[in-house]
Amino acid sequence: MQTLKVDLGERSYPIYIGEGLLDQPELLAPHIAGRQVAIVSNETVAPLYLERLSKALGAYSVLPVVLPDGEAHKNWETLQLIFDGLLTARHDRRTTVVALGGGVIGDMAGFAAACYQRGVDFIQVPTTLLSQVDSSVGGKTGINHPLGKNMVGAFYQPNAVLIDTTSLKTLPARELSAGLAEVIKYGLICDKPFLAWLEDNMQALRALDSAALTEAIRRSCAAKAAVVGADERESGVRATLNLGHTFGHAIETHMGYGVWLHGEAVAAGTVMALEMSMRLGWIDQAERDRGIRLLQDAGLPVVPPQEMTPAHFMEHMAVDKKVLDGRLRLVLLRQMGEAVVTDDYSKEILQATLSADYRAIVAQL
């Protein structure tokens, strides 16, 4: 087992990474203050791991809350089901909410924990690669709104993050690839040597090689922890973690939540960010193409939806959380391994990026 730390002073917490951690209650016990535990999961993950985790937490009074699966259910109605369960079972302020699932479950369970009786303890047990390397770390919680993704939520840090890498053995290949989009992101924004490692190990990762996955998760979580420790509430450097997300969120919102997986939309959005970075003269064509090939090798879509026009993108990006004083700030690459958040670009370059023929770009690789 490996242990990392998210350093937030008195609110610091550990990230445990290893095999078989779901069967080690001693890891979670120090982070559970009361006798009541609510395990929030979904209809896909619960049959696989809920009984196992409940057994490990047998010393506590465990309430299972099983929600419908998918991004389409990341809304007020589903969030209400968590509150219904907690109130019906009379859970008090010393309860601990445990999120068992992917990013949607983690975001909703965390938001519920932030709100219930004005805040109760919260533990993340992510079971997808995307949630293990990204959404479980850093305290972003929330739900979607019809007009924009993750527009309603709170910063609320967990007490601990427990990553059992064996849960990836039941992860569909499409979901694994979606998680790899976020892994690749770290190489692009802050760890150039990691890009070369990913190029050398991508097939091992897709084949679920345990050592490769553990290393990718460790390096990703270490990068995320460092950024969150420096900028918890995304007032500066943390926003660079959103490479590809502004374009990607527009895709998710326009196509309908869940039609494109989050990681798939981020991958296509990252290609657009690479293209715009190249048009600004910050990276060259070979570097753009290198990023696109790596995303392709991960089994990810690298062309935005053909039905989305530049006007569609602009409509959805206008409500992006990085908009300040009416100016859309974008996360772009100053160079490979270094990202910046900027509104220093011309409308012409943005329009050219939105209008680019990505099918032709990919075809010439």
Swiss-Prot record:
GO molecular function annotations of the record: 3-dehydroquinate synthase activity; metal ion binding; nucleotide binding
Disulphide bridges: none
Keywords recorded for this protein, A-Z: Amino-acid biosynthesis, Aromatic amino acid biosynthesis, Cobalt, Cytoplasm, Lyase, Metal-binding, NAD, Nucleotide-binding, Zinc
Residues annotated as binding Zn(2+): 182, 245, 262
Pfam family, one: DHQS_C
Coiled-coil ranges (or none): none
Binding-site positions, NAD(+): 69-74, 103-107, 127-128, 140, 149
Enzyme Commission no: 4.2.3.4
Domain of life per record: Bacteria
HAMAP family found in the cross-reference section: DHQ_synthase
Its job: Catalyzes the conversion of 3-deoxy-D-arabino-heptulosonate 7-phosphate (DAHP) to dehydroquinate (DHQ).
Protein's name according to its UniProt entry: 3-dehydroquinate synthase
Gene that specifies this protein: aroB
